[in-house]
Every structure is written in C-alpha cells, then in structure tokens.
C-alpha cells in the first residue's frame, strides 16, 4: 500500500490508521528518561496526529535472526504486534544481529527469517503496507567496531536492501537522519531524545510523503553558474510521489517524479555559455525561479586559512582586483564563527552541532568592491587569470575553506570508519591532529565540552561543506591545506589519497586536483619534509609517487613570510594555479612549463661543473634573476649538507667551481622551512623543492 492508498484511508477510515513500529532497543527507547514520551514511535504519534495510532513494539536486544541470541519472534512484543493487527508496519531490526554470536553463524538465514517475519505480520492481509528500514548507525566508539561489527553492519544493510528490492517494499534508511550526528548516539547505538526526534521526522515523511514540499540546495539561486559542456543534473526535494516540472528559458520543459523519500533528479541539456538563462522549478503549486543563470566552468577552492585569506586582507591588491566582470562569480561559504582563541557562545555551539556552521550565502559577481574584497584572494586571482585567458567562458569559484582545519575534517566519516576508525573517537585527546588543532577546538567548545561537535572534528567539514555539493558539476578542485598536519607527514600520506577519492566520488570522477605547496616560515622546521611529501603525493606522471592521476602542485616558497604563517601576497599563488590549470586542463602551451628537478649530473668543463637534469642544462630565468642562485645544498659521502651559491653563465646555465663540485653524491634544493631559493623556469615559475643523487658525466 503506497501513498495514494494511505490518503484514501485517512479520508474514509472511521478508525485511526494503526502503525506498528517493530524493532529492538532503539525502537523501545532504551536509555531515554521517559520512553513513553521520548521514543521515536511516541514522537511519531504526535507528528501524525489523531488520524493515526502508533504502537511501540520494540524489545531491547532483539535479533531478526530466529537462531540469534534473542529472536524477536520469541519476544512478547511480537505476539502483541500480531494481535494488534496494524495497517502499516515499520520494521527496524538487525543491529543486534551484528553480535559475533549471531551474524558469523547464521548470516545465510537472515533473508529467510526476514521474509518469514514479514509474512507473519501480513498473513491476514498480504496487501498491508510494510516499510523496512536499514539500520540506524553504529558509531566507531562501539567496543566491537574494529573487530567485525562494521563489516557485519555493512553486510546486513546490503541484505536488507536486497530483501526490499525482491519484495518491492518501501525501503528507508534510518542511518540517514543520524549518520553525521554521532553526538546523538552517546553509547554508539541508542539515540538521545533529539536523535529520536530526527528518526521520527524521517519516518513521518516516509509514511505521509510530507517532506516539506519543494526545496533546492542553497547552491541554487539567482546568478548561479552550472558546469558547461555536458548535460546538467538538476536535483532537489519535494513531497513523496510528486510531479516536478523544470522549465529552462521558457522553451524547454523537463519532467520528473519524486520517490517515496521526496528525492528527485533529472538531466537537462547543456546550456549556452553566450547568454544568461532562467530556470523555473514547479511542484504541487510551489514555484522556484532562478534568473541570470550562466553555464561556465565551476571550480571548488577549499582547504584552510591561506585559501580562506580574503582579498581585502592582502598586500598585493591590484587595480584589476576590482574590475567589473559579470562573468566571474563566486559562491562564498563562510563560517558563523572563526576558530579564534575564544569560547564560542551557546547559540554557536548549537548551530555547529546541527551542521549549520556555514552562513547562509548567495552567488556574487565580481562587479562590486564589497563583494570581491570578501572573496578568497587566491581564488579571486585564479578566477581573474582564467577569465583573462578564456574570455568566452564564465568562471565560477565555490569557496569553503576553514582556517586551521586539518585534512581529516574534509575526509568522509564513512571513509575514516573503514580506514582510520580510531580518529573518530575522542579525537580531542589523540595525537592524530597537531596539538594546536586540538587545543583550539577545546577552547572553542569550553562552555559545552561534552557531546559537542567542532569543525576540526574528523569528517565534519566533509559532511558540512563537501557532501552538499554532490551532483552539482565541477571542472576541478583547488586545494591549499597542510599547515595543520605538517607535524605528522606519515599520517597525511594516508589521508590525502582518501580525500582525493572522497572528493572525486562526491564531486566528479577523475576531477583534476591542483594543490598548493606550503610556503615557508622559520618557526616550523617540519615544513621542509612536508613540502617534499606534497611533491610525492602528486601523480606519477608529474614526477610524484601517487598512482592517482591528475594531481598537480604549485610551489609558493618564494611568496613566504619568515615570521607569519599567512603570507599577505596571494596574487602569485592564484596566478600560478591558473597558469598550471591552463596548461594541464585547458591544454594551453607556454603557460607554466616544467618545475621538477630530478637527479643531477655534473659535467666538467675546464674549472667548472655544469648542472644537468633530464639530459638538459639547468638554466636560470635571467629576466628574473641575474646574480647567484641560492637554495642549493650539496653533500659528500658523509651525508652532511652544506649550502652553495651557484653561478650562471651568459646563457643562464648553472655551474659550480671544480673545487666545490668534486666528490658530491647528493643535493637538496629549497629545503629549509624558510628559504630564499631563487631558481625559476622560463615562464617565471619557481622550481619545486627537491633532493636527489648527483653523478658525473
């Protein structure tokens, strides 16, 4: 029985419609002070009103498996549910089947037992409406999470879906309202009163089809930019089973139907980049209209504070920074509170817990000083340079960096559960994140230290800032982050590939990712090795060691401030990103060049040794630097490095005197945390920090 039949029952039934909630301790309301008032079935009753009667038939510890340690079909609640003869059944079982006494022994019987349970409940009337629920979450703090529970949980979730599909039953997933809210599951299993309310609202929507009507992602708005050059996916929310109509420019119409969860999605034809468009979305008398919509290339700019640094905070604002350009646009996601050294007030803490850390925002054009001054300086200069080189292509930047954020906050909870689950529990007190990150988070949540979320929490910013962008369409990603992870490069080496996979799965398969190498600062000696790690994490075809493709790196050590982690000069960073993008993504020649040094050979010529890499002379860009070349360190067999100033001949070729060049075995370039290295390629891009062997030819 679907939504149409339900509407008929509501209209004509003399008796209330009976809804039986079948389940375990989560349904029963275990740990709640007043289950008769706070459990999700009790909340559901209040939401549904007098036309319904909701029965709570949950039994703590119950298993779906008939041979489990506490089979639901042997519990008194099962007999009561049979006798009650409900019109609708909502079944939520399986959590206790993850127990090692159950799933490893009887997994093959789960499907049979689930079908038998459904048949028993509906034997008087096989047409009764049955909704089966995939399980509410088990969090990483569960005592058996790492010893089988997560694997069993995933297998049971998949089996429940197969059962629903085979019987053509309505399927809901009670992980959806709770998954990114671990603080609402204090014992890893059972929801708090607030968690039960979230569950009840979700089940209410599934029962009635009332999902609040037509709504769209906040990304949709006047002035938005959609990715050009391909069909565009438009997705949104409506009431369950509703017809949705989309009009594009009044001459194209597209239709979709929402599913029982109110979700709908459609593909529309690609849009012209030459003019603006209007998109109108309608459903059940509701109407949303978006004007001045462009098709262009959409880039995500993310990371931490050096990406977040605003244009009006920099020292290299140029007059073109405020040049009017309606076809350069940004969707700037800014936090409701900066992670400064302060205790956040209660209202901020509540919003953070509710995943409302980003302010409401709207699309902006580069036409007003007050707009562009608030943009990320790096992102603005990147977009400005692309617009100058691609005048026929609108460029849009979606900006969501957060100052101080560690990389793990941008990795999904799901990915961390399956790879680094220990990071998800008591993260404030574990050394995965650098001490500054953990201490700053504790300062921010000092007024509510228990059960409080923070944007630095592993997985938080993925759920808050990345996942909501799913399906929107992007050209590529700019990533400037690492300051908060540089003290643990071995962990970053594990996390960065996970982030790449998450971003690409969410935002677009094989999207190019352009990373910014950390600049330099005297007080952070660990940055030397971290910068080299960042090079290793680029793609193999770029000279790195990462098998993931399309990952590129821009050096910035020459833009550094020896005393400030936030260099105030951002023009070069954004411009270099744009030039690298023009070369790699847009295949423009003579934009960026080669910046990677490999092993070096020394070729003797009289009293000099010339430096050769990859078969060619290493040359300086004489238009930028005419004197000695700084930044090289050499070592003999003892492995002790010493700095050397290299000279250049009239052709810019680098050489060193024979007295210095004899007996060398290795070199480093631009290695110190703060360096004045000054070797540039022919396009004015600094050569990346490097180390390698030296041989003689």
Name each model feature, range by range:
Residues 46, 72-210, 453, 458-595:
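Alpha-helical cap/lid subdomain in secreted, periplasmic
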Residues 235-314:
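Extended acidic/polar, glycine-enriched regions
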Residues 218-219, 225-231, 579, 583-627:
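Surface beta-strand/loop "capping" patches
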């Amino acid at each position: 029985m679907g939504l149409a039949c339900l509407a008929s029952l509501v209209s004509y039934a003399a008796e209330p419609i009976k809804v039986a909630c079948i389940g375990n301790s989560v349904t029963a309301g275990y740990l709640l002070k007043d289950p008769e008032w706070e459990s999700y079935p009790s909340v559901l009753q209040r939401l549904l009103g007098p036309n319904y009667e909701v029965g709570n038939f949950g039994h703590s510890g119950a298993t779906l498996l008939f041979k489990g340690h506490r089979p639901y079909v042997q519990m008194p609640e099962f007999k009561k549910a049979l006798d009650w003869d409900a019109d609708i059944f909502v079944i939520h079982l399986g959590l206790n089947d993850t127990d090692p006494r159950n799933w490893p022994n009887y997994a093959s019987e789960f499907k049979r037992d689930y079908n038998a349970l459904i048949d028993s409940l509906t034997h008087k009337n096989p047409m009764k409406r049955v909704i089966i629920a995939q399980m509410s979450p088990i969090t990483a703090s569960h005592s058996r999470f790492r010893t089988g529970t997560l694997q069993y949980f995933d297998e049971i979730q998949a089996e429940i879906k197969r059962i629903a599909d085979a019987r053509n039953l309505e399927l809901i997933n009670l992980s959806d309202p709770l998954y990114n809210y671990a603080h609402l599951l204090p014992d890893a299993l059972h929801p708090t009163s607030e968690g039960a309310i979230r569950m009840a609202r979700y089940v209410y929507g599934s029962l009635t089809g009332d999902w609040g009507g037509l709504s769209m992602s906040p990304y949709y708005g006047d002035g938005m930019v959609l990715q050009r050059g391909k069909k565009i996916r438009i997705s949104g929310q409506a009431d369950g089973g509703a017809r949705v109509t989309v009009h594009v420019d009044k001459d194209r119409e597209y239709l979709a139907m929402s599913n029982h969860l109110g979700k709908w999605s459609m593909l529309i034809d690609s849009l012209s980049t030459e003019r603006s468009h209007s998109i109108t979305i309608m459903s059940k008398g509701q109407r949303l209209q978006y004007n001045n919509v462009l098709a262009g290339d959409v880039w995500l700019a993310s990371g931490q504070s050096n990406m977040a640094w605003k244009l009006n905070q920099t020292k290299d604002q140029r007059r073109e920074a405020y040049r009017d350009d309606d076809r350069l646009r940004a969707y700037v996601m800014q936090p409701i509170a900066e992670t400064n050294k302060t205790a956040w007030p209660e209202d901020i803490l509540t919003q953070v817990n509710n995943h409302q850390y980003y302010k409401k925002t709207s699309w902006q054009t580069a036409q007003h000083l007050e707009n562009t001054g608030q943009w990320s300086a790096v992102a603005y200069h990147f977009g400005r340079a692309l617009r100058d080189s691609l005048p026929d292509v609108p460029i849009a930047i979606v900006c969501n960096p957060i100052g101080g954020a560690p990389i793990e906050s941008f990795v999904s909870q799901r990915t961390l559960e399956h790879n680094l689950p220990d990071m998800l529990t008591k993260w404030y007190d574990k050394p995965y994140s650098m001490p500054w990150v953990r201490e700053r988070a504790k300062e921010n949540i000092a007024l509510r230290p228990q059960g409080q979320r923070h944007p630095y929490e592993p997985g938080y910013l993925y759920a808050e800032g990345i996942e909501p962008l799913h399906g929107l369409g992007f050209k590529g990603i700019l990533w400037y982050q690492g300051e908060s992870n540089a003290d643990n490069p071995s962990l970053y080496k594990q996390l960065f590939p996970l982030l790449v996979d998450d971003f690409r799965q969410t935002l677009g398969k094989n999207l190019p990712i352009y990373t910014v190498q950390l600049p330099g600062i005297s007080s952070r000696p660990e940055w030397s090795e971290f910068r080299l790690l960042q090079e290793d994490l680029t793609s193999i075809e770029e000279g790195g060691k990462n098998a993931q493709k399309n990952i590129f790196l821009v050096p910035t050590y020459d833009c550094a401030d020896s005393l400030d982690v936030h260099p105030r000069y951002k023009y070069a960073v954004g411009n270099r990103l744009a030039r690298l993008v023009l070369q790699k993504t847009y295949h423009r020649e003579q934009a960026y060049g080669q910046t990677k040094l490999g092993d070096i050979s020394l070729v003797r010529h009289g009293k000099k040794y010339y430096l050769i890499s990859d078969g060619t002379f290493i040359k300086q860009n004489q238009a930028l630097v005419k004197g000695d070349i700084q930044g090289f360190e050499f070592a003999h067999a003892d492995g002790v490095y010493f700095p050397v100033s290299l000279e250049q001949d009239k052709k810019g070729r680098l050489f060193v005197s024979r007295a210095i060049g004899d007996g060398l075995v290795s070199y480093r370039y631009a290695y110190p945390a703060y360096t004045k290295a000054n070797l540039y390629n022919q396009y004015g891009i600094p050569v990346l920090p490097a180390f390698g062997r030296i041989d003689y030819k």
